[in-house]
Amino acid sequence: MEAIPVLAGPTGSGKTFLALRLGEEVPVEVVSADATMVYRGLDIGTDKPTPEERARVPHHLVDVLEPHEAMSVARFLALAEEAIAHVLSRGKLPLVVGGTGYYIRALSEGLHDLPPPDPGVQEALWAELEARGLEALLAELARASPEDARRVGKNPRRLVRALEVLRRTGTPPARFPKRPPRFRYKKLVLWPDRAWLFPRLEERAKAQFARGLVEEVRGLLERYPRMPTALQAIGYKEVAGHLLGAYGLEEALERDIRAVKAYAKRQYTWFRHEPGDVVYLPRGGEEAYVGFRDWLCLHFGL
């Protein structure tokens, strides 16, 4: 089975730029592995490729859900594997691009075959999370399965799902049998120095505010006043807090910058332990393009 290329790395490292530039030279189609780009209407805060860019370089799993719809890792896996197969069937090369490590890990390593979600149990767990706090519930999961606790990290949605499975079945998710991956993957992880990345994250956040992020979030809140999961994304959550009167605009920007830097740190930690066929490229943005093309030439003949 031929391998599928994966371009991963922390937020702001230039993955979208590299994919778009490659797509202008080579007949590739992007399969997005980004947990927020799946949502329609979340454009500025996700740095989503524009419709014009996506017309030049086809993208899959972008703008496929409304903000109130849920995207689980199982749903992502099914959609992504379907998209990859579709691209291959037309003689094109799929390029998986994204920074949602959990999605990329599911693609390349397979996914545990868990029972379907139970909304009632999940609702009770969300209430418990609000009352007891994330650390208390994470400690409960860690006692049963340190592996699951490491995997969910501080992601409340994944924590709720893991505890739901544990409490319903008595078995933590990591001990369920795993469905093998449908395809084989080779991964290139952008690994720029933090001194290079973090100032760019600050400038990107400021640019998003200048481009109209506040207006984008205001429109989403008018349509979805109950703050669905999609509006908990970095940037959207911080701006929503401002629009709901919790703090001023300047503090919203400061919170956004802190949140995106913290997210990038978590991505560095996650991708540092990426399994499988992985190469780390110690650059980002335009500086990484030559290394990216060399890697593609070596492994894929592009």
Swiss-Prot record:
> Keyword set for this entry?
ATP-binding, Magnesium, Nucleotide-binding, Transferase, tRNA processing
Methyltransferase among keywords: no
Q: Which InterPro entries match?
A: Dimethylallyltransferase (IPR039657), IPT (IPR018022), P-loop_NTPase (IPR027417)
Instruction: Kindly list the biological process annotations in GO that this record carries.
Output: tRNA modification
The protein's required cofactor(s) are namely:
Mg(2+)
Residues engaged in binding ATP = G9, P10, T11, G12, S13, G14, K15, T16
- A Pfam family for this UniProt protein? IPPT
Site (Interaction with substrate tRNA): residue numbering on this chain:
T100
Q: Name one GO molecular function term.
A: ATP binding
Where substrate is bound, by residue? Answer: T11, G12, S13, G14, K15, T16
- The protein's enzyme class: transferase
What Enzyme Commission number(s) apply to this enzyme?
2.5.1.75
Q: Which reaction does it catalyse?
A: adenosine(37) in tRNA + dimethylallyl diphosphate = N(6)-dimethylallyladenosine(37) in tRNA + diphosphate
Its assembly, as annotated, is: Monomer.
Function comment: Catalyzes the transfer of a dimethylallyl group onto the adenine at position 37 in tRNAs that read codons beginning with uridine, leading to the formation of N6-(dimethylallyl)adenosine (i(6)A).
NCBIfam families associated with the record: miaA
Q: Which PANTHER family match?
A: TRNA DIMETHYLALLYLTRANSFERASE
Give the record's family classification.
Belongs to the IPP transferase family.
Q: Tell me what this protein is called.
A: tRNA dimethylallyltransferase
Organism expressing this protein natively: Thermus thermophilus (strain ATCC 27634 / DSM 579 / HB8)
